[in-house]
UniProtKB/Swiss-Prot annotation:
Organism: Staphylococcus aureus (strain NCTC 8325 / PS 47)
Protein name (record): Response regulator SaeR
One of the record's GO molecular function terms: transcription cis-regulatory region binding
DNA-binding region per UniProt: 127-226
Classification lineage: Bacteria, Bacillati, Bacillota, Bacilli, Bacillales
One of the GO BP terms on file: regulation of DNA-templated transcription
Residues with 4-aspartylphosphate modification: D51
PANTHER family for this protein: REGULATOR OF RPOS, RESPONSE REGULATOR SAER
Gene: saeR
Subcellular location(s) of the protein: Cytoplasm
UniProt PTM comment: Phosphorylated by SaeS.
InterPro entries referenced in this protein's UniProt entry, alphabetically: CheY-like_superfamily, OmpR/PhoB-type_DNA-bd, Sig_transdc_resp-reg_receiver, WalR-like, WH-like_DNA-bd_sf
Length: 228
C-alpha cells in the first residue's frame, strides 16, 4: 500500500485530500504542522503533498530537511503561491509537480497516480551499467573496464562479477551463484565458482584495481565490497 504524507495548515484541505486518497486505497498520514512533518519524514513515506506557506516551518524548509537527511521522497507542492518565480523555485528544489489552489482533489489524485506509475516504470528498467570508482561493468556488451581500459573476461566471469557487484555488500552463497549464473545445482560442480572468482581477482589485480574486492566469507559464500 502506498504511504502518502499530506502537509497543509488548512484542516479542511487536509481532510478532503485524506478522504479522496483513502478511497483510492492509499495509506494516508496527515499533519497541519510543518514542524511535525519533519518528525514524520522517513523511508516509510512513499510520496508527499506539501503546502508551502505555513507558520514556523514552511514547505521549502521540509524539503531542505528531507535532503539533509538524505531521504529521496517524491513530492508535489499544493499551494496558493501562483507566481511563475514560485513555481520555478519549487521545481528547482526538486518538486515533481506543482498544483495551484484552488484545486480539484480528483485532479490531484490523478497527478499522483500518474507520477507513481512513471516511477514504477523507471525502477523496473534493467540496469545496464555499474560503476565502482575506476571499475565499470557494461551489461549489454558484457564489457569490463578499469580506467577506460578493457579487461578481457569470459562470459561466465563477467556474469559472475555482475551478479556479485549488483548485490554489493551482500553475502551470496556458492549454491545461489551456481544456480543464477550457471543454472545448475551446487552439488554438480562446487569448484566452478572458486575457479572463476580466482580468475576475476587476478584480472582486476593485474589492472591495479584494488579499491573493491570479492571477499570470501568462510562457510557462507562471497561478497563484493570496498576493500578495507
Amino acid at each position: 500500500m502506498t504511504h502518502l504524507l499530506i502537509v497543509d495548515d488548512e484542516q479542511d484541505i487536509v481532510d478532503i485530500c485524506q478522504t479522496y486518497f483513502e478511497y483510492e486505497g492509499y495509506k494516508v498520514t496527515t499533519t497541519t504542522s510543518g514542524k511535525e512533518a519533519i518528525s514524520l519524514l522517513s523511508n516509510d513515506i512513499d510520496i508527499m503533498v506539501l503546502d508551502i506557506m505555513m507558520p514556523e516551518v514552511n514547505g521549502y524548509d521540509i524539503v531542505k530537511e528531507m535532503k539533509r537527511q538524505k531521504l529521496d521522497i517524491p513530492f508535489i507542492y499544493l499551494t496558493a503561491k501562483t507566481q511563475e518565480h514560485d513555481t520555478i523555485y519549487a521545481l528547482t528544489l526538486g518538486a515533481d509537480d506543482y498544483v495551484k489552489k484552488p484545486f480539484s482533489p480528483r485532479e490531484l489524485v490523478l497527478r499522483i497516480n500518474n507520477l507513481l506509475t512513471r516511477m514504477k516504470k523507471y525502477h523496473h528498467q534493467p540496469v545496464e551499467q555499474l560503476s565502482f570508482d575506476e571499475l565499470t561493468l557494461i551489461n549489454l556488451s558484457k564489457v569490463v573496464t578499469v580506467n577506460g581500459h578493457e579487461v578481457p573476461m569470459r562470459i561466465k566471469e563477467f556474469e559472475l562479477l555482475w551478479y556479485l557487484a549488483s548485490r554489493e555488500n551482500e553475502v551470496i552463497s556458492k549454491s545461489e551463484l551456481l544456480e543464477k549464473v550457471w543454472g545448475y545445482d551446487y552439488y554438480e560442480d562446487a569448484n566452478t565458482v572458486n575457479v572463476h572468482i580466482h580468475r576475476i581477482r587476478e584480472k582486476l589485480e593485474k589492472e591495479s584495481f584494488t579499491t573493491y574486492t570479492i571477499t570470501t566469507v568462510w562457510g557462507l559464500g562471497y561478497k563484493f565490497e570496498r576493500s578495507r
